[in-house]
Amino acid sequence: MPVDAWIREEVEIPEGVEVTVEGYKVKVKGPKGELEREFFWPGIQIFTEDGNVVIYKDFPRRKDVAIARTFAAHIRNMIKGVTEGFTYKLKVVYSHFPISVKVQGDEVIIENFLGEKAPRKAKILPGVTVKVRGQEIIVEGIDKEAVGQTAANIEQATRITKWDRRIFQDGIYIVEKAGKPITF
């Protein structure tokens, strides 16, 4: 059963940002760079109108409404990325062995984690920059998903299994996402 006669989600395009829609591809160009993404769902139309990106569907079902709002959120994140960018902050925590972290090419190398001889590695996705400042790691970029995945890769590289995590709290943890502190 359709939920309504139609759904129409609008995303405002701010000044200095150019959005072009070609078929299912949406390109967003701004002062920090350019992002391109494909959005496809049967029956959903995406177009620009009066300085807005419009996501439209006739006689939507519940799933169609959810997908239309998801597309709108992704486009909002693309616009925010090319205007402001996204920043994640991670903190290096250790009590037993001092951890050393360095960036080498498209990988983050974590050495001496829990006294291990072999270094652990975390992949940096394309379009993301990683800076190490003492015990703080800053991950920046314009694509929210790539920045978040890179931060998660770094955090997961130091995940401890089979040991009591209440005692062995060494690792690298995300402490701030997009300017908002993470509480534990």
Swiss-Prot record:
Listed Pfam families: Ribosomal_L6
Cellular component aspect of the GO annotation: cytosolic large ribosomal subunit
Database matches in InterPro entries: Ribosomal_uL6-like, Ribosomal_uL6-like_a/b-dom_sf, Ribosomal_uL6_a/b-dom, Ribosomal_uL6_arc, Ribosomal_uL6_CS2
Domain of life the protein comes from: Archaea
GO BP annotation list: cytoplasmic translation
Keyword terms of this UniProt record: Ribonucleoprotein, Ribosomal protein, RNA-binding, rRNA-binding
Gene3D superfamilies: Ribosomal protein L6, alpha-beta domain
Transferase is among the record's keywords: no
Disulfides per UniProt: none
GO molecular function (one): rRNA binding
Job description of the protein: This protein binds to the 23S rRNA, and is important in its secondary structure. It is located near the subunit interface in the base of the L7/L12 stalk, and near the tRNA binding site of the peptidyltransferase center.
Subunit structure: Part of the 50S ribosomal subunit.
Family per record: Belongs to the universal ribosomal protein uL6 family.
Protein name in UniProt: Large ribosomal subunit protein uL6
Source organism phylogeny: Archaea, Methanobacteriati, Methanobacteriota, Thermococci, Thermococcales
